[in-house]
Amino acid sequence: MSRKCQLTGKKANNAYAVSHSHRRTKKLQEANLQWKRVWWPEGNRWVRLRLSTKAIKTLETKGLSVMAKEAGINLNKI
């Protein structure tokens, strides 16, 4: 599985690591992803998702069903 948030689609960003002498080397800024078990009331079961920490905070306000619908995810297949 790729390092990508399953609800928001967040993934790594290409950036430069800049030294004191201003030499630049490429680096990846990875998203802060966590495995999270979320209760899905409509399905009456737990769903295990790989989410960014921003998505976890948004999930608490919006709810799982609304966010999954916005992302176009069928929770029955997960």
UniProtKB/Swiss-Prot annotation:
Keywords: Ribonucleoprotein, Ribosomal protein. This is Large ribosomal subunit protein bL28. It holds the Pfam family Ribosomal_L28. GO terms for cellular component: ribonucleoprotein complex; ribosome. Belongs to the bacterial ribosomal protein bL28 family. SUPFAM superfamilies: L28p-like. The gene is rpmB. GO terms for biological process: translation. GO terms for molecular function: structural constituent of ribosome. NCBIfam families: L28 (TIGR00009).
